[in-house]
């Protein structure tokens, strides 16, 4: 999370909106913490080679996923199903296993073999038979989602200009 005061400070230091936007959307997150990459696959490879910065970025990301999922679970009064999607959720079996292990108190039980078999191309149930909550890996066509969002923004801009 980011203290809003940081944004005010950067603007006071002469940063323009484009530079702040680049910092927030291009230079933060996994890249900002690791100094290496925003790609989890790259970071996993670096961490396997002993890179402490990559390990720190992965650990922080995993912690935040667990924290936010736990908070949402509390707000919702429980879970019926958890879905892992998007590039990392679809493709990172280690992350899915770590998240489910830390949220075992909710009744989540992941099947390690099924988790490894999820291919990111098909919806795949990865919960163990004794799990009280279903766990799914759901593929996302991120390119299509981005194109839809861009088209919506263009329609919005055209409507305003008309």
Predicted segments — roles?
Residues 8, 53, 87:
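Conserved short-loop catalytic and cofactor-binding motifs
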Residues 5, 18-19, 38-41, 52, ...:
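Generic alpha-helical secondary structure signal
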